[in-house]
Swiss-Prot record:
This is Protein quick-to-court. Residues 161-201, 406-420 have a biased composition (Low complexity). Expressed in the third antennal segment and the maxillary palp, with increased expression near the cuticle of both olfactory organs. Also detected in the second antenna segment. In the brain, expressed in the central nervous system, with high levels of expression in the visual system including the retina and optic lobe, and uniform expression in the cortex. Detected in the thorax and abdomen, with increased expression in the ventral ganglion. In males, detected in the reproductive tract including the ejaculatory bulb and testis. It comes from the Eukaryota. The name 'quick-to-court' derives from mutant males being quick to initiate courtship of both females and males. Disruption phenotype: Adult males appear unable to discriminate between males and females when choosing a mate; either because they display increased levels of courtship behavior towards males (when presented with only males) or they display the same levels of courtship towards both males and females (when presented with both sexes). During male-female courtship, they also begin courting virgin females earlier than wild-type males, suggesting that their increased tendency to court both sexes may also be due to an increase in male sexual activity. Residues 1-42, 143-210, 360-379, 393-428, 441-471 are annotated as: Disordered. Residues 668-716 form the GRIP domain. Residues 441-454 have a biased composition (Polar residues). Residues 17-31, 362-379 have a biased composition (Basic and acidic residues). It holds the Pfam family GRIP.
Length: 721
């Protein structure tokens, strides 16, 4: 950040030299006009303006080396520079260092060395300093030099500027460096050089100081101590770009410049080097503000920003304007939406009022369609009646006067934005922050004009504000709106009446159809009841029949069980009889055998064979008994084979027993047993066809047939019948 103190000097001693330069105006006219805006307004053609820029850069050692070149005292560091004639020994340097003005924000802290183009620039600087009578080299203390040399490096730029640089930089190297460091700032042309004037001895100034003792912190730089009148007012010509100032004193800007320098000198010890101590600050965002509406030096809040983040006051103001315009557009859109909603709600209210009026009797309606008296006691509930609310037609909304006014507003906004974009493009060269130096017009006047145009495009109602004929258009729009409103009211009233009539007819038809359906359903229900009453006795009879059949089933099951038991008993009795008959027959055979061969004896082999056959039959009987146990629950009958095997077994046992008894007492024969045995053999011979041959042999043995008779019987059985 760079602090600039600008001071323009105009001395009577120099005016004579200004008159001498009028002959050379045509040759140097191109160099006198400054195209770059400056902070302090100046006349269009200034004959004598001197700019002294003292920049202290680097370290204390460098300041110590330059102490002899800065006779102002304090080691070349003071709040106001005192410029005297440079000794002749310094004029012969091959590379003298000249200080030039650098307005770029990027070159802060850099020292610019240039080759002098004209030797007269140094002389002009020295003569101007001599005319100011600020030579206090003899009175300056040497202690300040050492103290400043031992201090920290400073970054100070004191500019006593009337709009031009001290050293004219016209070479290509200096211009290229200036362009690289400040691409957005144009180069300031050089100031026409002033020929050397007679030097004013410094002893006169010292004598005047001695005569009027004065002491302050500014030491020899104080204006009161020097008693030199410094005027910053341009006495030659006033430029149209010069802003209005308060004519308090001839030295209008001097007090503020002195305050700025004083604030810098008093705050270097405890605060930042570039801070400001002004009792007033900028009010409108520009440098043209202050206690007396003068040019002051103040610290900007955006000074620390560099690169793309930095915005000039013009850019900040334009960004603020764009943001406000966006907010204005958003507010207008919200207003349009609210207007549309208001129109829709108005129509709904009208429709509801008409619908409410239609529900009352015709004699209670009033003549006006807007105000309708309704008998509240006869209104139906919300379940019986539903209000008719139709949506607003889009075509009517687009044809409304508000929609037309919105279209006009949008067109005006587009044209206004185009004008503002063109104005921003034209004023882009003024991004240095000097609002008052714009070539077109003042920023404040342009902002006020833009604001008036933006405010003129819309009224508080959101309708277009037209300059010429606005009253007539508004009246016609209101009349059209009222006509449309009346037409809508009449149309909706007619529609509501038609809907009510159609609804009544539809309701009556629906009731009739529903009554017919209800009667048909009631008739069907009666028929169903009759059928049900007829079917109930049948159902009871069927249930009784089912109970009777269940009883009969139980009786039949009991009878079946009894019959099976009887049959089993009969089979068992027949089996027992068969066993007894077999026993008798075996006994008879054994008896016959014993009678025929009394002397023969039964061999052991025959007995063993009979015993084996008997054991086999016993095994069969055991198996049959097991099957009988398994089937005993079902009361199953024995088969014929099982009965015969059991009978044969029993008969053999009986025969064996009787054989043994016959052997014991051969004389005893039981005819009853023989008869019973014969009876059983004949019965089974006739009934059991499968074992008929065995039964036949038993009969033959019981009846004691001979072998010839047995052969004839067997032959007769083999012949087919």
């Amino acid at each position: 950040m760079m602090t600039s103190l600008q001071l323009e000097t105009s001395l009577p001693a120099v005016e004579e030299q200004v008159q001498r330069e009028k002959d050379n105006d045509s040759a140097e006219d191109s160099h006198t006009a400054s195209t770059t805006p400056t902070r302090i307004p100046h006349p269009a053609v200034a004959r004598f303006r001197r700019s002294a820029s003292l920049r202290l850069r680097g370290n204390p050692a460098e300041l110590g080396l330059r102490a002899e070149h800065c006779p102002a005292g304090g080691g070349g560091f003071s709040s106001r520079a005192k410029l005297t004639a440079i000794p002749s020994s310094l004029e012969t340097r091959s590379h003298p260092v000249h200080l030039r003005r650098n307005r770029s924000w990027c070159n802060l802290g850099h020292k610019t060395e240039q080759e002098p183009e004209v030797e007269a620039s140094t002389e002009a600087l020295c003569n101007a300093a001599q005319c100011l009578s600020l030579d206090k080299e003899a009175l300056a203390p040497k202690v300040g030099n050492s103290s400043m040399a031992n201090g920290k490096p400073r970054n100070l730029s004191l500019q006593l500027n009337g709009g031009s640089d001290i050293s004219s930089s016209g070479t290509s190297s200096s211009s290229s460096n200036n362009k690289e460091s400040s691409p957005r700032t144009t180069r300031t042309p050089r100031t026409p050089q002033t020929p050397q004037t007679p030097q004013t001895p410094a002893s006169g100034v010292a004598a005047s100081v001695a005569e009027t003792p004065h002491s302050c912190i500014r030491q020899g730089n104080c204006v009161k101590a020097n008693q030199v009148k410094l005027s910053t007012l341009h006495e030659s010509k006033i430029s149209p770009r010069t802003p209005p100032v308060t004519p308090d004193s001839p030295s209008t800007y001097l007090d503020d410049d002195i305050d700025s320098m004083y604030s810098f000198a008093t705050t270097t010890s405890g605060r930042s080097t570039m801070s400001c101590e002004h009792p007033y600050v900028a009010r409108n965002g520009t440098t043209f503000s202050g206690r007396k509406m003068k040019y002051v030096v103040h610290c900007s809040n955006y000074a620390g920003q560099v690169g793309p983040d930095y915005l000039t006051p013009t850019q900040r103001a334009q960004r603020q304007i764009r943001r406000l315009k966006e907010l204005l557009c958003i507010a207008r859109q919200d207003l349009e939406q609210k207007d549309t909603e208001l129109l829709r709600l108005t129509r709904e209210v009208v429709e509801l009022r008409l619908f409410k009026a239609s529900l009352s009797s015709p004699e209670e309606r009033s003549a006006s369609s807007d105000a309708v008296t309704v008998r509240e006691a006869e209104l139906k509930t919300s379940q019986d009646v539903s209000p008719i609310v139709d949506m607003v037609d889009e075509g009517n909304a687009k044809g409304s006067p508000r929609h037309l006014s919105r279209q006009q507003q949008q067109q005006a906004n587009h044209s206004l934005q185009a004008m503002q974009m063109s104005a921003e493009m034209q004023s882009s060269y003024a991004d240095s922050g000097h609002f008052e130096d714009l070539t077109m017009s003042s920023v404040h006047s342009k902002d006020s004009q833009t604001q008036s145009e933006a405010c003129g495009t819309a009224t508080p109602d959101g309708e277009a504000d037209v300059g010429c004929g606005a009253g007539g258009d508004s009246a016609s729009n209101l009349e059209n709106y009222e006509l449309q409103r009346q037409e809508l009211i009449s149309m909706y009233e007619h529609r509501i009446e038609e809907l009510i009539r159609s609804q009544d007819s539809a309701t009556s038809d629906l009731k009739r159809s529903h009554n017919d359906k209800v009667e048909a359903l009631l008739q069907k229900l009666a028929e169903c009841n009759t059928r049900y009453s007829d079917m109930v006795p049948d159902y009871e009879q069927a249930k009784q029949r089912i109970r009777e059949l269940e009883k009969q089933l139980e009786d039949l099951q009991r009878k079946l069980i009894e019959h099976e038991e009887k049959q089993n008993k009969m089979y068992l009795h027949m089996y027992q009889q068969g066993q007894e008959a077999e026993r008798i027959s075996r006994a008879d055979q054994a008896l016959d055998l014993a009678q025929r061969q009394p002397e023969s004896k039964v061999s052991i082999n025959e007995l063993l064979h009979q015993l084996q056959s008997t054991q086999d039959e016993l095994e069969n009987i055991r198996a049959s008994e097991c099957r009988m146990r398994e089937c005993g629950s079902n009361h199953a009958l024995l088969t014929a084979k099982e009965a015969i095997s059991l009978w044969v077994l029993g008969a053999r046992k009986t025969i064996y027993r009787r054989l043994l008894e016959a052997q014991k007492n051969r004389t005893h024969v039981d005819p009853e047993v023989t008869l019973q045995f014969l009876k059983s053999a004949i019965f089974y011979f006739l009934t059991d066809k499968e074992n008929s041959q065995g039964h036949l042999q038993a009969i033959e043995s019981i009846l004691e047939f001979t072998d010839a008779e047995k052969q004839k019987i067997s032959a007769a059985n083999r012949t087919p019948k």
